[in-house]
C-alpha cells in the first residue's frame, strides 16, 4: 500500500473542477448524478489499484452522494420555494477554489519571471484613493489583498536602485509559511506590512504573498482590513494549529 495524489490533483475540489472543465459542465447548474458517477470512478480506480486514497476524497464522495440523494427526494412546490438548493454550498466552494487557483497561477508565473531578473519604476497608486464608507467587519477579497501586496512591493522598489538586475533568490514558499506560522504562535494576529523591512528583494515579497494566499485558501489564516486600502491584518484561521 502506498499513498499518491489522485492524478496529481491537489484535493477533491481540484478533482471536481477538473471533471467540470473536462465535461464542460455548467458550474452554476451541476448535474449531480453525472458528476458523482465520474468522481466515484476515480476513487474506485484508486481502490482497485490498492492505492491509499486520502480521507478528504472519501469525505467528498459522501457529500456528493448526500447531495445527489437530496435532489432525488420528491418535494412539493412550496418546499421547493423554501428549501435551498443542496448544491449551493458546493458550488460556492468550487467557485472560490477556482478563483484562488487562477490567482495562484498568475502569481507563480510572475515569480518565475522575477526569479530571472526584474527592473521596474515605482507605480503610482494614488488613483485608488476613495472616500467611500468601509465596514471594518467585512472580510476582504483577493483584490484588497493584491492592492496591499502592491503597496509593499512598491515600497521595496523605492529602496532599490531604479535599474538593477535582481539575482535569483532561494527564499521558498515553505520558508515564508514557516515565518507566518511562527509569528502567529506569538500573536493571534499581526499586520501584513510588519513582515517586511522594505529592504528585502521583491521576490521575497512575492513569496510571502503566495504563502499567505495558500494559507488563506486552507483556512489556516483569515485576512481582515479595518479601513479600505488600509493595512491588512493576518489572523489565525479555523484550521490554524499551534502544533
Curated annotation (Swiss-Prot):
Transmembrane spans: none
GO cellular component: cytoplasm
Keywords: Cell cycle, Cell division, Chromosome partition, Cytoplasm
Statement: the UniProt record of this protein carries the keyword Transferase: no
Subcellular location: Cytoplasm
InterPro entries xref list: ScpA, ScpA-like_C
Keyword Cell cycle: yes
One of the GO BP terms on file: cell division
Biological function: Participates in chromosomal partition during cell division. May act via the formation of a condensin-like complex containing Smc and ScpB that pull DNA away from mid-cell into both cell halves.
Complex and partners: Component of a cohesin-like complex composed of ScpA, ScpB and the Smc homodimer, in which ScpA and ScpB bind to the head domain of Smc. The presence of the three proteins is required for the association of the complex with DNA.
UniProt similarity note: Belongs to the ScpA family.
HAMAP family for the chain: ScpA
Name of the protein: Segregation and condensation protein A
GN (gene name): scpA
Amino acid at each position: 500500500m502506498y499513498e499518491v495524489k489522485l492524478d496529481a490533483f491537489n484535493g477533491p475540489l481540484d478533482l471536481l473542477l477538473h471533471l467540470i472543465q473536462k465535461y464542460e459542465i455548467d458550474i452554476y447548474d451541476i448535474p449531480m448524478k453525472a458528476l458523482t458517477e465520474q468522481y466515484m470512478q476515480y476513487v474506485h480506480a484508486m481502490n482497485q489499484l490498492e492505492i491509499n486514497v486520502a480521507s478528504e476524497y472519501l469525505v467528498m464522495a459522501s457529500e456528493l452522494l448526500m447531495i445527489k440523494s437530496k435532489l432525488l427526494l420528491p418535494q412539493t412546490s412550496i418546499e421547493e420555494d423554501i428549501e435551498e438548493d443542496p448544491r449551493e454550498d458546493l458550488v460556492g466552494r468550487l467557485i472560490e477554489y477556482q478563483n484562488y487557483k487562477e490567482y495562484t497561477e498568475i502569481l507563480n508565473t510572475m515569480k518565475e519571471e522575477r526569479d530571472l531578473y526584474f527592473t521596474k519604476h515605482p507605480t503610482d497608486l494614488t488613483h485608488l484613493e476613495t472616500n467611500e464608507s468601509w465596514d471594518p467587519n467585512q472580510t476582504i477579497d483577493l483584490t484588497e489583498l493584491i492592492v496591499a501586496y502592491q503597496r509593499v512591493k512598491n515600497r521595496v522598489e523605492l529602496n532599490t536602485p531604479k535599474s538593477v538586475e535582481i539575482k535569483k533568490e532561494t527564499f521558498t514558499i515553505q520558508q515564508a509559511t514557516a515565518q507566518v506560522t511562527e509569528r502567529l504562535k506569538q500573536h493571534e494576529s499581526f499586520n501584513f506590512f510588519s513582515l517586511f523591512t522594505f529592504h528585502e528583494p521583491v521576490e521575497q515579497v512575492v513569496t510571502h504573498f503566495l504563502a499567505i494566499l495558500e494559507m488563506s485558501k486552507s483556512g489556516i489564516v483569515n485576512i481582515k482590513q479595518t479601513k479600505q486600502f488600509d493595512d491588512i491584518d493576518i489572523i489565525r484561521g479555523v484550521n490554524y494549529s499551534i502544533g
